[in-house]
Amino acid sequence: MACCSTSFCGFPTCSTGGTCGSNFCQPTCCQTSCCQPTSIQTSCCQPTSIQTSCCQPTSIQTSCCQPISIQTSCCQPTCLQTSGCETGCGIGGSIGYGQVGSSGAVSSRTKWCRPDCRVEGTSLPPCCVVSCTSPSCCQLYYAQASCCRPSYCGQSCCRPACCCQPTCIEPVCEPTCCEPTC
């Protein structure tokens, strides 16, 4: 795993203390994956250059584990939106790949606002989660890339004992994980 790699196109997998998966951040490293910086960093957990990768073309980060700017990435097209996200499945502002609902109507994925949140000890800026149904608190408030997945047309999940916190709006997370269906 690359230093401070991300999964989910922008959600950091870095833990606190500079641990990135099983690797500790080294003095220098080069991240070249789609959702990573493309330049060699003086400290892989403290990049200071403007990111130009395909998934983070205009992001400026003070820490690879702590993005501070709103993303305009190909993988997170709704992140410029910090408020006014849609509040219902398929109501305006939706983006492709809909599903056929129980009534037979096509229901598109919809943008949902995600407030400032804590992710593995680091902060993420306000963003939107693309979902067909209202995302869970786990997804909105504790959206750890290693634990949670966004809701794709109603299919949401959390890996057990990993996502939800005592202050979570929802009392428990799903005990098992499920795969997106669309």
From Swiss-Prot:
Ranges occupied by Sequence repeats: 27-36, 37-46, 47-56, 57-66, 67-76, 77-86
InterPro entries, per the entry: KAP
TM annotation in the entry: none
This protein's GO CC annotations: cytosol; keratin filament
Keyword annotations from UniProtKB, A to Z: Keratin, Repeat
Region (6 X 10 AA tandem repeats): 27-86
Pfam families reported for this sequence: Keratin_B2
Function: The keratin products of mammalian epidermal derivatives such as wool and hair consist of microfibrils embedded in a rigid matrix of other proteins. The matrix proteins include the high-sulfur and high-tyrosine keratins, having molecular weights of 6-20 kDa, whereas the microfibrils contain the larger, low-sulfur keratins (40-56 kDa).
Name under which the protein is recorded: Keratin, high-sulfur matrix protein, B2D
Lineage of origin: Eukaryota, Metazoa, Chordata, Craniata, Vertebrata
